[in-house]
């Protein structure tokens, strides 16, 4: 299915998953009041891992959202007010619950990093975490490199450190040993892995998924009208349906692997389809399987 882009310590990580029930986390900053199509990879990833018997922790990044992730940005993000961030958390939490079973904390949890980040003592953090980060190395990270010409604020420079601290906190609190995220988060995620290994001398890992892009490298999830949201109040069911109807053939086949639980044999069978047949088959599978995981799927069925 090509669900993995990169991972740390591949052999160790495979053994780690095979030997035990693993606690994994995925962090999402509440910078909007709804997820969009680009977030489906992370939401489905958590659902898959939970289905495989592991525990997933969905982390709402209300604390890190106060800073703003510089990854992939050419300028500093607008600073959000605390009230807006809290309102976004409330809406996004409801959407997460459509993918992840949060009723049993042994299977899934939803936490907010503002609960621990806002309580931090700056000097204590510097002493605990600071010695384990090299500024020279941080400046070579992809998330910072592209900003060196246009300017990188000290505020944003701290984002990697706080995200790494999240992983450390979750490791100590819940024995969380794996972080997952999009491939554009690779540099930030490495910081947390290395921090835990240096402080606790134990295994911690991260793995990323490929970014959802078209064949020419453009991120999926946006149209000329803007983002394609999962909230039906922001993107109507018909508009959502039309977005998927217009997905190019190569991406339709890829999405079938990403967003369904179809066995590999069925996915391979779809490779024989050409042109519009790929998309028609994709939509038919949504009908047949009645995939209720996402607003995306259930509302597609309503329109169909």
Question: Could you tell me what each predicted segment is?
Answer:
Residues 1-183, 190-193, 200-205, 218:
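NTP-dependent nucleotidyl-transfer catalytic core
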Residues 196-304:
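Conserved nucleotide- and phosphate/pyrophosphate-binding catalytic cores
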Residues 187-188, 302:
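Well-ordered secondary-structure scaffolds
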């Amino acid at each position: 299915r090509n669900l993995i882009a990169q991972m740390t310590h591949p052999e160790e990580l495979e053994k780690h998953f095979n030997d035990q029930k693993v606690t994994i986390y995925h962090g999402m900053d509440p910078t909007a009041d709804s997820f969009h199509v680009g977030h489906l990879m992370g939401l489905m990833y958590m659902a898959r891992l939970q289905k495989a018997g592991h525990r997933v922790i969905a982390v709402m990044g209300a604390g890190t959202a106060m800073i703003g992730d510089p990854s992939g940005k050419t300028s500093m993000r607008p600073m959000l007010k605390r009230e807006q961030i809290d309102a976004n958390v409330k809406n996004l939490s409801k959407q997460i619950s459509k993918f992840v079973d949060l009723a049993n904390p042994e299977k899934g949890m939803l936490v907010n990093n503002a609960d621990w980040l806002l309580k931090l003592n700056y000097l204590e953090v510097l002493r605990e975490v600071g010695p384990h980060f090299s500024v020279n190395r941080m400046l070579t990270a992809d998330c910072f490199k592209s900003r060196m010409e246009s300017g990188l604020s000290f505020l944003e420079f701290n984002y990697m450190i706080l995200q790494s601290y999240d992983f450390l906190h979750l490791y100590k609190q819940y024995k969380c040993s794996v972080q997952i995220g999009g491939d554009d988060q690779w540099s930030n995620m490495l910081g947390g892995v290395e921090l835990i290994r240096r402080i606790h001398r134990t295994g911690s890992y991260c793995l990323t998924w490929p970014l959802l892009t078209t064949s020419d490298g453009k991120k999926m999830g946006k149209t000329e009208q803007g983002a394609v949201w999962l909230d039906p109040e922001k993107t109507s069911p018909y508009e959502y349906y039309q977005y998927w109807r217009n997905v190019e053939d190569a991406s339709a086949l890829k999405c079938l692997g990403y967003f369904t639980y179809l066995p590999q044999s069925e996915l391979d069978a779809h490779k024989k389809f050409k042109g519009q047949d790929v998309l028609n088959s994709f939509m038919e599978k949504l009908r047949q399987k009645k995939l209720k995981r996402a607003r995306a799927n259930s509302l597609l069925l309503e329109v169909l």
